[in-house]
Amino acid sequence: MLKIAFDKSYRHPLDEKHRFPMIKYELIPEQLIRENTCNDSNFFIPGCIEDKNVLTTHEETYYRKLCDLKLTPKEARPIGFPMSKSLIKREKLISQGTIECVSNSLKNGVSMNIAGGTHHAFRDRAEAFCMLNDQAIGANFLLENNLASKILIIDLDVHQGNGTASIFNLDNRVFTISFHGKKNYPFHKEKSDIDVEFDDDTGDIEYLKRMDAVIPNICLLYTSPSPRDRTRSRMPSSA
């Protein structure tokens, strides 16, 4: 059964002039139900995350300052949201949602988190509406609990998953692929294992063609049961 992490707090209250489209976290569940992709029974409310599961990914000093609302103005400015306890609670809920989703996926094959994908959060700093990297936290949860020996992260957001790429740059257990706009944020990009960059106005056919040129081969290689010596070499962005 498809399990979907969602809580009403995912739509955090913001000033109506704020540029972040927070309403999408309310509209997505409504659309999924409207199109009969799922029903109310598919949704679950995440529990409370344990600090130890965050600290497999994030530097402790940063995490404590974040939770205590003690980031300096310079540290908080890249987040882009007004800081509050409820915002941090929401961020932790999202990360726990991804932990529960990856656990459900081991049983059911697939799960989703309505507000997941906080891929701009680095190990020791926040960036671009992302404070805790739920993808990295979920991956490390599986690895630390011996529920997986290697993880493949495929990021299809228009923005590069720079935080995720940085966090796993030296971890051979996690392979990162990012498909993103060449000229889009972040303007200084990190290096994923594979970065596939697109020009503005790329159409569906070209996008899918380049996905098909990368993903099947990587999935076949990376899920092979035989051990292999994977180097951290990168494919060119034109892959």
Feature locations, PLM:
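Well-ordered alpha/beta subsegment
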Residues: K150-I153, V158
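Active-site rim loops that border cofactor/substrate pockets in soluble metabolic enzymes
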Residues: S192-A213
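Hydrophobic alpha-helical segments, chiefly the membrane-spanning helices
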Residues: M235-A239
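Glycine-/small-residue-rich active-site loops that bind phosphorylated ligands and cofactors
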Residues: E127, H159, G203
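Glycine-rich phosphate/diphosphate-binding loop of Rossmann-like nucleotide-binding domains
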Residues: V158-H159, A165-D193
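Short glycine-/acidic-enriched loop or helix-start segments at secondary-structure transitions
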Residues: E16, R123, G163-T164, S233
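An acidic/histidine-cluster motif and surrounding catalytic segment
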Residues: M1-I137, F141-A148, V174, G181-N184, ...
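Conserved small/polar residues in nucleotide/adenosyl-binding loops
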Residues: Y222-T231
